[in-house]
Structures are given as C-alpha cells and as structure tokens.
Amino acid sequence: MRSAQVYRWQIPMDAGMVLRDRRLKTRDGLYVCLREGEREGWGEISPLPGFSQETWEEAQIVLLAWVNNWLAGDGELPQMPSVAFGVSCALAELADTLPQAANYRAAPLCNGDPDDLILKLADMPGEKVAKVKVGLYEAVRDGMVVNLLLEAIPDLHLRLDANRAWTPLKGQQFAKYVNPDYRHRIAFLEEPCKTRDDSRAFARETGIAIAWDESLREPDFAFVAEEGVRAVVIKPTLTGSLEKVREQVQAAHALGLTAVISSSIESSLGLTQLARIAAWLTPDTIPGLDTLDLMQAQQVRRWPGSPLPLVDADVLEQLL
C-alpha cells in the first residue's frame, strides 16, 4: 500500500545573503515523503533562485502530478532537475539504496575579516580546505585576501568560486596579487570568466587550476580532459536525478578529474542527504556543503553539531 505527503516550507535566511545580485530573504521549497508498507523515503525539492531554470511554484505543480502518478503505480521520473533529484532521493531511501554513511566534513565558506578567518582556519583539525567566494568585490582585493590566507597558513588549500564574474583583465588583476609560489595551493577556481574559452586562457596564463560548475548544465558541455581543468562541481538540485549525478561523477573520475558534491543552499534535510551522496560517490573528496549557517533553522533532520533550532514536519504546510 502506497501513501505520500508533500510539504511546502519557507526558512528565513541570514540578512546578508545575496545571490546573483539579489537578496535572498527566505529559502523556499518542498518535501516529499513516500511510504510503502513499513518503509518511507524523503526528498527535498528546492530550486535555487537565479540558478535553477524552474521556480518552486513550477516544481510544486510537477511534483504533485508525479506523486499522484506514483500512487497510481507509475514511477517514471520527471525531467525537471530539482523534482527529479528530490523524488529520486525519496525513492532511494524507500528502496534502501542510498547508503546511510555520510561525509559531514565541510570546506568552510570563508567571508568576513581576513584576520578572523586566519585564526579560524589555523585551528581547523585535519586537512585544511576552505572555500572563498571571489568576484563580489574588486579583483585586486580578492587577490590580496587569497594571498594573505595562503601566506598565513602554509598547509591551507583554497577552493575559489568566481561564478563567471571576471573579464580576462580582471582575472589577470586577481592573479597578479597571488604569489606564484602559493598558486598550487589553490585547489581550483570555479568558472573564473564569463566564457569557457576565457577561463581556459586564465588557467594557461596563470597556472591556477580551474573547475567547471555552471558549464555542466549547458547543452554543449562534454566531459573531456583539458589542460588546466582539475575539477567539476556537481550541484544535484540543479543536475537532476541521483542516476544523472552518479553518471557525472563517474565521467569526471574516468578523466582523472576531482568531482565535488556541492550544496544549492538546501535545508538541513537536503544537506544530510548530500553528505550521504558525497560519502557514497566521492568518498575521498571533501564536499562543498557549508551553507546551513546561512539559514535560521533546521528542518526534519539535524545536521550533526549544528546549534540551529529544528522544525518538525508536523508544523509545515501540508499540500497532500
């Protein structure tokens, strides 16, 4: 006997949260809970404004239609990426095919005063890997901050993300302020320039390795080994089903590329599932999941060690 619930939710965000030049005041999304006999599985559907092609309102229509079909015995996955991902997670939990083991290690997202960051990062146990958003301020300032962090902490490796913010000139301005002796400790810089060709040129000219992120979701993208390209950053909410995520990880690994499972600012429920996916598909790589602190609450499932209050499913708005 099958049954299902769909919940709609909204979480207040930190006041300073800006995405693609827009302030994100709340994170909006949906949960689906599927039950069959004694088993149940949960999934999160939370399109990311400015990044997902679909809105959560559009996702809600597709999700409710899919759930009704599933209740009637038809389980074919929808095409819409956020719905395909959430539904496939719920089905995987239902079938017990999503391993429970999770990788809760985080590459902390660094912002704020560099002196405070140095103290925080110096105290990090184990492998020191952190993420810095660049491209939000002047490229010269970004270069100086990155150089300062690498100089102060000799065993630190940084993942940088420019979200295609730079022209070739700005990329050169950034690199000019990063000591060539430190550049090998930039694990990768995600999508430095507005075009892939400009990003490739940046890698060749600076010796700073790059990673593809947005490019993975473009129709002309192909997985190929390229000089200067070290990694791909996979955001499952923007990618689609678990199977598609696994195919992309396998394609990257076959080329010797690092594959990083990364957050699209999901709630704690979605983040704990991403931590399980990371442990399963990319066990040797620290995932990019340090986004929970951008929110003011957790929901349904806790992220280990988070002090944020937990909201239970029974107080969420139930649509089905």
From Swiss-Prot:
Its EC number is 4.2.1.113. The active site is at residues 133, 235. Pathway: Quinol/quinone metabolism; 1,4-dihydroxy-2-naphthoate biosynthesis; 1,4-dihydroxy-2-naphthoate from chorismate: step 4/7; Quinol/quinone metabolism; menaquinone biosynthesis. Keywords: Lyase, Magnesium, Menaquinone biosynthesis, Metal-binding. Gene3D superfamilies: Enolase-like C-terminal domain (3.20.20.120), Enolase-like, N-terminal domain (3.30.390.10). Mg(2+) binds at residues 161, 190, 213. GO terms for biological process: menaquinone biosynthetic process. Signal peptide: none annotated. It comes from the Bacteria. Pfam families: MenC_N (PF21508), MR_MLE_C (PF13378). SMART domains: MR_MLE. The keyword Oxidoreductase does not apply. Its cofactor is a divalent metal cation. It catalyses: (1R,6R)-6-hydroxy-2-succinyl-cyclohexa-2,4-diene-1-carboxylate = 2-succinylbenzoate + H2O. Belongs to the mandelate racemase/muconate lactonizing enzyme family. MenC type 1 subfamily. Converts 2-succinyl-6-hydroxy-2,4-cyclohexadiene-1-carboxylate (SHCHC) to 2-succinylbenzoate (OSB). PANTHER family: O-SUCCINYLBENZOATE SYNTHASE (PTHR48073:SF2), O-SUCCINYLBENZOATE SYNTHASE-RELATED (PTHR48073). NCBIfam families: menC_gam_Gplu (TIGR01927), PRK05105.1 (NF003473). This is o-succinylbenzoate synthase.
